[in-house]
Swiss-Prot record:
This is Serum paraoxonase/arylesterase 1. Plasma, associated with HDL (at protein level). Expressed in liver, but not in heart, brain, placenta, lung, skeletal muscle, kidney or pancreas. It is linked to Microvascular complications of diabetes 5: Pathological conditions that develop in numerous tissues and organs as a consequence of diabetes mellitus. They include diabetic retinopathy, diabetic nephropathy leading to end-stage renal disease, and diabetic neuropathy. Diabetic retinopathy remains the major cause of new-onset blindness among diabetic adults. It is characterized by vascular permeability and increased tissue ischemia and angiogenesis. The active site is at H115. Glycans are attached at N253, N270, N324. It comes from Homo sapiens (Human). GO terms for cellular component: blood microparticle; endoplasmic reticulum membrane; extracellular exosome; extracellular region; extracellular space; high-density lipoprotein particle; spherical high-density lipoprotein particle. GO terms for biological process: carboxylic acid catabolic process; cholesterol metabolic process; lactone catabolic process; organophosphate catabolic process; phosphatidylcholine metabolic process; positive regulation of cholesterol efflux; response to toxic substance. It comes from the Eukaryota. Belongs to the paraoxonase family. Its main location: secreted. Changing I102V: Probable risk factor for prostate cancer; results in decreased activity.
Length: 355
């Protein structure tokens, strides 16, 4: 009888493990391969070799790019060098990147590890760049002021808070005000790995201001990219491992109310919003297994989606670009400017295409 009970328990355990393993593979979209979708004229951006994880394009065509991210469990081609912020002028016929110098006596450039970024321009046309930073595996938000003539960033402030432990991306709604996604609940790397494997969906979104910090949305399976509609009324949140983009209504007191969700057959990463049309442009990972378990012989693919009329009952989703990783590995972000598309990656290169 004891052997029968032990065998039964073992069988139940194996069945649960197999079911959970299958769920884990589904969340990572582990079996998907992409069919190429090409654009007419694409060129790799010179000077970007170690990632372009997030980018934002100003209305005047200046693009800010975060490069050199070191993230636990993700490949890095230059793990011992600090990250940087790059500038690209998309008004140029053949734009190149320039590394922005960082000034400010209290900022440690040697530990700079930039992740998500967002800009805010005030009434005096002063432009602020907010950057998620992971110095020594921690999470901070660095506040910079862009000095256009000097082509540099003046460091103004480092923001830390207990509700910002695992920041991934932010969207600025003021010089020191933002919504931010925490992609994990736990701080400990071991517990984070189990959190992800078990699909606990405990990650969350925070509203931060100097006077108030609070959780405004929760229950995400790896909250990732975040952005806001051009009119400031709606917030978009990418849930990476659930393959969803959520639409929230933003209220005057900065709280969020869920409106709808869209499902995709891909892992949605960063969200860019076209300021003229309101369209969403999303950098995606068709197969998350290839991102988290990197193999140079079978690299992660890239994919870009465009979402039109997201607030209507029938949004239009278009696969604008897809490639199996031979050109561009691990796309995370895409943004448009005057008929051109700039695509960034978590640890690889960047691609500039005509639409």
């Amino acid at each position: 009888m004891a052997k029968l009970i032990a065998l039964t328990l073992l069988g139940m355990g194996l069945a649960l493990f197999r079911n959970h393993q299958s769920s884990y593979q589904t969340r990572l979209n582990a079996l998907r391969e992409v069919q190429p979708v090409e654009l007419p004229n694409c060129n790799l951006v010179k000077g970007i070799e170690t990632g372009s994880e997030d980018l934002e394009i100003l209305p005047n065509g200046l693009a800010f790019i975060s490069s050199g991210l070191k993230y636990p469990g993700i490949k890095s081609f230059n793990p011992n060098s600090p990250g940087k912020i790059l500038l690209m002028d998309l008004n140029e016929e053949d734009p190149t990147v320039l590394e922005l110098g960082i000034t400010g006596s209290k900022f440690d450039v040697s530990s700079f590890n930039p992740h998500g970024i967002s800009t805010f321009t005030d009434e005096d046309n002063a432009m602020y760049l907010l950057v998620v930073n992971h110095p020594d595996a921690k999470s901070t938000v660095e506040l910079f002021k862009f000095q256009e003539e000097e082509k540099s960033l003046l460091h103004l402030k480092t923001i830390r808070h207990k509700l910002l432990p695992n920041l991934n991306d932010i969207v600025a709604v003021g010089p020191e005000h933002f919504y931010g996604t925490n992609d994990h609940y736990f701080l400990d790397p071991y517990l984070q790995s189990w959190e992800m494997y078990l699909g606990l969906a405990w990650s969350y979104v925070v509203y931060y201001s100097p006077s108030e910090v609070r959780v405004v949305a929760e229950g995400f399976d790896f909250a990732n990219g975040i952005n806001i509609s051009p009119d400031g009324k709606y917030v978009y949140i990418a849930e990476l491992l659930a393959h969803k983009i959520h639409v929230y209504e933003k209220h005057a007191n900065w709280t969020l109310t869920p409106l709808k969700s869209l499902d995709f057959n891909t892992l949605v990463d960063n969200i860019s919003v076209d300021p003229e049309t309101g369209d969403l442009w999303v950098g995606c990972h068709p197969n998350g297994m290839k991102i988290f378990f990197y193999d140079s012989e079978n690299p992660p693919a890239s994919e870009v989606l465009r979402i039109q009329n997201i607030l209507t009952e029938e949004p239009k989703v278009t696969q604008v670009y897809a490639e199996n990783g031979t050109v561009l590995q691990g796309s995370t972000v895409a943004s448009v400017y005057k008929g051109k598309l700039l695509i960034g990656t978590v640890f690889h290169k960047a691609l500039y295409c005509e639409l």
